[in-house]
């Protein structure tokens, strides 16, 4: 009996390395798949090398059927439909016009299709039907790199990379000098904080975990400002951050709207009060559009959302 027990105990120790080998093999396969993606990224031409970029463009022309550069002008959606799955359409015939140099807002309850629409405009959600034109050029016919050179997207969870503040900001403008970096930080009211640390060499942990949510978002917007594109899409860029950061970001959006085309997607309607035009989505359909004043007076979908939010935000203030 003792011998059998000993064999059983030894057998468990014998098979343990085999089980570990299987786990290590799985990890190795994941690593190989990830390394392939990294190598493909490293093989992309570096901006600034004209000869390489021209060669890359020539190859891309052949691969994509001679796509076109991004136009500079209005962004127009006509009868826009989009589905993540074949039988589940998210956007149902949306029609919007974003005038060049305007401040346009897209609002609606959660799940109405706001972020899906912004992803279509950025070229991330492909396979739409209908028409989306940027400066007169159909979105599906525009080079992806040309689109990125003309439209900057800022979401609520923009990513900061491990390194330094300088490293992260230079991703927006690789040739920017320190003066431009400080200017961008000043615009988002982070310059004083960064100077109190180690300046532009201040360390940034993975995903910016050593900063608050509001600080991370401000750093991301500073990087976006350095990118300096004609169009900026703010997709819930002020959600889940402190009130002070939200107010500072909205001041910056208002300032940008004087020189850039701004598309602001927000669940908080107070942030879109000064928009030139507000589009209201419900379940993937456009139900209303107009200025804040016009929509409130219409007493429809927007007015209902506005009144509900105002009641919540003002609750208890009268008792103070």
Outline where the language-model segments fall.
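Cytosolic ends of transmembrane helices, especially the final helix of ABC transmembrane type-1 domains
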Residues: 14-41
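Conserved E/DxxT/N motif and adjacent residues on the DHp alpha2 helix
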Residues: 40, 47, 170
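ABC-type nucleotide-binding domain
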Residues: 55-320
